[in-house]
């Protein structure tokens, strides 16, 4: 999936869209990537002399990958988006630096109606940087304006 396809599937937009492409997708698994350019604004403040990607952004990238996966499982024509309701067993393993690419792999482990239970892993240059388990509930979204 291209960036345009991703934007069709989920409501996230710049400056808070943390996916560039979807490498593979099935009914229960997605792999997506995001390149992190050195001039990314958040690196100016986290941290100015030793920039690293915040762990919460790694989690958000996994959440957004799951949103693309879940969008394929929801009825067509509905205005719904998954909202994170639970976050468990988060582990940060290695740092992510400017000019690197992160890869998010998310697996759907269980579904109960509009609630989805997932496991995620973020890797960078072959090393796991983050592992997490989380749940989302598909919620109706209203468009402003």
Where are these regions (language model features)?
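A residue-level detector for short acidic-glycine micro-motifs
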Residues: 21-24, 89, 94, 108-110
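HotDog/MaoC-like acyl-thioester-processing domains
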Residues: 27, 97-103, 107-145
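Compact, glycine-rich, soluble single-domain proteins
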Residues: 44-71, 84
